[in-house]
């Protein structure tokens, strides 16, 4: 039966190719001119016959350039093995979810249906061209989505270094002519280690989720501590075994061994501790409210987090070959790398970031205190820095305290100055000068010292947001699991280690010299011999070769991106 079906498909394909050549002959003749005119007319229209909404001007211009390379003839039917090439493309669309993409965005079912119809009929020239150009349009969209992402990063307030422009016209044309569409798609994937690891994790989590008829749910009668007993320990162990399995196709055991020791101890406690550490919780193995919420989070939610994180990684250019620094806001962590091989980090430390929605009770301040997402280059360090206080903090927080306590400024090493120069002379806190602080004619800064909010050092990468990395006297806050306490700048847990990393190419800067500079009497500025790229990023899922870590969506960016992707997909609906 299979041989008969295959033979029939081959006959249909041969019939289709002969029919295509009859309708669209090559060479300078009337038939060829008719094909050219029909193609040009189709590509000059505002919308494509297969899609409800108009395509963009950029898409139309790209398609026009693509078909001009082929003298406005059929592209996909002009190769040696068109059937295999078209099937390869449709299979690529079917597998789009494994890339964190949506198959319907590329009209997968519509094209698959039309492909069957074409092979079982005598299509018109218009039908051939509509199908051919639909393949090209969706391939362009797929490659663009895979390489650059579906939503512009600036639309989501991600201000990142733009990626290098890609000549999609020549690449698509070459891929079709050489029948290598799959290879081109592979080449368009981000090469970032983080992306590839998330892609692997996505496959695993999809496999796990497919096994469940309903989400896994645990309902312990009380807080479960190591050594406690519960009938759900076996179920918990099976679930965590599947999550921690190195296999890409792990199985969730549902038939719990009645002989299992239902005492919460041993390896299952270790796995819970690892889970807590991955989610920035205290890794004590105690299953309380927060840990229970983690365990009961549907796998579909984790899949969405992975997909959204992959989307954001598509926005990033290739990482620099030399050292670079990454801050992931939801993870409250900083990593410093010697090279662009992300799996080999040189430093890994806690950070404190700008306040989240939950931390901001005032609706108007919800976004103003968040740490922005952008990239830059650390170019110099400031030891024993002054803190030049932003006007918003001055008027909203400090001056109201001064009005209640006239000694507040002096007790906190705060001084009024005409400008922020190191040589500026402090002015008295007279009523007249206080009024000039309100009107921005004078400024307030904090002197270097143990009370200084920036600690003993700050790491400067000039930007439009006045954001930098810095030390802090408030080291107790690093013991918290959720560390969103700043006004936007990023406080680092181990500033001396980060300084040693940053000054690696500056001759003579040893640990001892850094310590001396941090505790000297006067401020000093040190320019880096080699600027270090820094990326302030936002990803609620990160994967390594051993496990996936998920983080809370503290700024609600996942929700915003998910909405933008859904709205964008509505604009790509096929008839």
Descriptions of predicted regions:
Residues 4-17:
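Bacterial N-terminal signal peptides that target proteins for export
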Residues 15-17, 143, 298, 303:
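Intrinsically disordered low-complexity regions specifically enriched for long asparagine
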Residues 25-27:
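N-terminal signal peptide c-region/cleavage motif recognized by signal peptidases
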Residues 29-61, 160, 182, 186-575:
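Well-ordered beta-sheet/strand-loop patches within structured domains
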Residues 31-164:
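Cationic-aromatic interfacial patches
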Residues 140-204:
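Histidine-centered catalytic/metal-binding microenvironments
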